[in-house]
From Swiss-Prot:
HAMAP family: Aspartoacylase (MF_00704)
Listed name of the protein: Probable aspartoacylase
Known EC number: 3.5.1.15
Residues reported to bind substrate: R56, N63, R64, E164, Y275
GO MF term list: aspartoacylase activity; hydrolase activity, acting on ester bonds; zinc ion binding
The entry's keywords: Hydrolase, Metal-binding, Zinc
Zinc is among the record's keywords: yes
Pfam families linked to this entry: AstE_AspA_cat (PF24827), AstE_AspA_hybrid (PF04952)
Length: 294
């Protein structure tokens, strides 16, 4: 792969996710902390109006506005559609990028700790993630759906990925998570600098990759009303194994609903507040061990 010349850090794609938004504000106030000799680092506050309002979005979810067809559709005129076009104008598209790496900062009410969310398994990204999880075992790595036709901001770039941290409430700054996220960003930038110098560290360990397999909705009645909640046995237990027969939900009348799958899964984004409107109680993943150097 060619030399890294420009890196973009985006925060506040969702306006009430303060960790990323305030990190971007810090980096804009003290740009020297993210600059490296061999590449430029630029910062973008993703959704300024939503950030000012303390809301996830103004009219629609900005992180669902980056489908190529949507970016080319001049009839889409919501604030977030316009903002997506502006951001794409800076970052470029996957087939014509203006930057080499995109880091999109997010936070979650789920207990995701320090997570890297990938939309593809590019060898460069896998080696980066293997390095990050090797030096900090608390870093988890997820692989979601293939990015071809994706509407996420990260899909604008082949080397785009998300840093997702939690648990933290919406519209709240948590100093510990802020500092951990900040340090993770510095580690990533250091890695990119070493890559440009040809000094990539060799990783011998396998990478644990949590691969997305599907979503699960809450129990509902015939009117679509929620009739249950996350069972206390799995609340805040993201990335832990869920076996067939384990309790999954607790209904309003106190009955446990078990996981009826046939294989062990590893739930993530358990009880994410922003996913209630999307009909998602959690995401299921399967755990794979891969060799990033193969």
């Amino acid at each position: 792969m060619n030399k890294i010349n420009r890196v973009a850090i985006v925060g506040g794609t969702h306006g009430n996710e303060f960790t990323g938004a305030f990190l971007v504000k810090k980096f804009q106030q003290f740009p020297e902390v993210i600059q490296k000799p061999s590449f430029e680092t630029l910062t973008i506050l993703g959704n300024p109006k939503a950030f000012e309002a303390g809301k996830r979005y103004i009219e629609k979810d900005l992180n669902r506005c980056f489908l190529t067809e949507s970016l080319q559709n001049t009839n889409l005129s919501s604030y977030e559609d316009i903002r997506a076009k502006q951001i794409a104008g800076v970052l470029g598209a996957e087939n014509k990028p203006n930057v080499d790496v995109v880091i999109d900062l997010h936070s979650t009410t789920a207990n995701m700790g320090l997570s890297i969310i990938l939309g593809n398994q590019d060898p460069f990204l896998l080696k980066l993630c293997a390095y990050l999880s090797d030096i900090n075992p608390l870093v988890k790595v997820c692989y979601t759906i293939p990015e071809k036709g994706s509407n996420f901001l990260r899909s604008l770039n082949k080397l785009g990925f998300v840093i997702e941290v939690g648990a933290v409430a919406q519209g709240v700054l948590n100093a510990e998570l802020f500092q951990k996220t900040e340090q993770l960003i510095y580690t990533i930038l250091d890695y990119l600098e070493q890559y440009n110098r040809g000094n990539i560290p060799k990783i011998n360990n396998l990478l644990a990759l949590y691969k997305f397999t599907g979503t699960v909705d809450y129990p509902r009645n015939e009117n679509g009303d929620i009739q249950g909640m996350i069972h206390p046995d799995i609340q805040f237990r993201d990335y832990e194994p869920l076996n067939p027969g384990d309790p999954l939900f607790l209904t309003l009348d106190g009955k446990a609903i078990a996981y009826e799958g046939t294989s062990t899964v590893y739930p993530i984004f358990i009880n994410e507040a922003a996913y209630y409107e999307k009909g998602i109680a959690m995401l299921f993943t399967e755990k794979q061990l891969i060799n990033p150097s193969s």
